[in-house]
Amino acid sequence: MEITKRNGMAEPYNKEKVAIAIRKSFASTGQSVTDETILTLVNEVENFILSDTGNRHVERIQDEVERSLMEHGFYAEAKNYILYRWQRTERRKALNHIVNETGDETITDTLKGIGQDFPRNEYSLTLLAEKFSSFYKPEMTPDERLTALIKAAVELTTQEAPDWEFIAARLLNFQLSKKLTEQAEFAGVLSFYEKLRYLTDEGLYGSYILASYSPEEIEEAARFICPERDKLFNYSGLDLLVKRYLIRTRSHEPIESVQEMYLGIALHLAMPERHNRLQWVRKFYDLLSKLEVTMATPTLANARKPYHQLSSCFIDTVPDSLEGIYRSIDNFAMVSKFGGGMGMYFGKVRAAGGNIRGFKGVAGGVIRWMKLVNDTAVAVDQLGMRQGAVAVYLDVWHKDLPEFLQLRTNNGDDRMKAHDIFPAVCYPDLFWRMAKEDLNQSWYLFCPNEIMTIKGYCLEDYYGEEWEKRYLDCVNDSRLSKRSMSIKDIVRLVLRSAVETGTPFTFNRDIVNRANPNNHRGIIYCSNLCTEIAQNMSAIETVSTEIRTEDGDMVVVKTVRPGDFVVCNLEIGRA
């Protein structure tokens, strides 16, 4: 026996569907019902179907369910069943409206899935259709219509209905899937291995992946992919991955799905494994795709690519020389190019008004160099994905501290501002002890180059009691020029900046260096952008510059001592 569906298609009659509908009507009123009652009602509906061979439409069958419920006195259940049918009708209308307005019938399954997974009234497709209609314009392209539909779901997100963000993510994933299908057809790829071969030939994928794995291993790994895990994302997370981390063509079209990205990262990370390598690929893929762990930005962005710089955090010591300062800025540009964040210690750079080669008062101070760092962070933006990120550290006793503490504030001389970097201050214990004793005490600021020239040592190279002894020695040395401020005024500047900009960050150098297990081999001047790294630091130094003749051409060979250029990776797991 067959019945006619709403779309005119015929399908075999299934009495279990009728039973489920009746059970739901009782569940909606909180009333229990026996299997015998259910069977009686189902049999009555079935008898009608058998007797009326000319009208076996699904709507007519549902009418008979209503009649049967009311004949047996189940009026509340019949009422809820009628309401349920009306809501389903409204959802179908909304679904059809969205399909017609987007002009894409392939979105039907996605919309049905949303309706099934988010059945509550606040996530009704009717609301989505109404919001979408407010954005819809007839002249929109199909992709613009999808974007408007996604925007509609995003704008429906509220504190009372937060799951609209997950609905928006599903719609965004549908849009992404359509684009990926178009790109795959254009490239003529039918399998994951063919896609990797194509991307490698285009210079978008690291050749080392195909060199490390056989085609059979690649295809076996491809079977690990679980598209259902795309549903774990909310809109914000998926949108970020699509915009920043998926591989794109040179015309900026995505050519990699989120799950393919995770599998590519897993293939990269598992390359060194000698035993059961594909099992490790699967473990890494599962951890990533289930959102149980996330990698640092450079790993997400660069693993599997030709330039596979995976580290996230770097620290450089900026030396007090023109060559050294520009070398540090160049290093930051290269780190930023491949997704790393940077911490830069400027405590060795001479203060404004300092001497240069004996010429008095000509030094411009650290602010002008920090402005260059700021502009580098903005300019080197990882192919437009995001601008660079850098924290600049200065000692609380540095002469340029007051100007430094106003780098990001909105008042004052705009030529002394750098709004796109993150200032941080290095404090000794002495500063906090004096602040606790009496905020009105004087604190003295010095030029590090002047201390080195007159005293013969670098004050920033010490910590703890030795630093305090040398600091007081500098305070009492009349040959050194000093800038005096009350501790209260310094704290006021710090708090004003913190309230207005969220900076400066704090680095308590004495505490860190006392805990440093390698303090016999160097000193930790500062931390990185995230302020979680503490490793010995030293500046890169030029050893020699030599002019040679090679193959008849003059070449300049520069030898440098690398110093301690700090690097660290960061991964975050979910408890």
Please provide the spans of the model-predicted regions.
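Extended catalytic cores of very large enzyme megasubunits
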Residues: 1-574
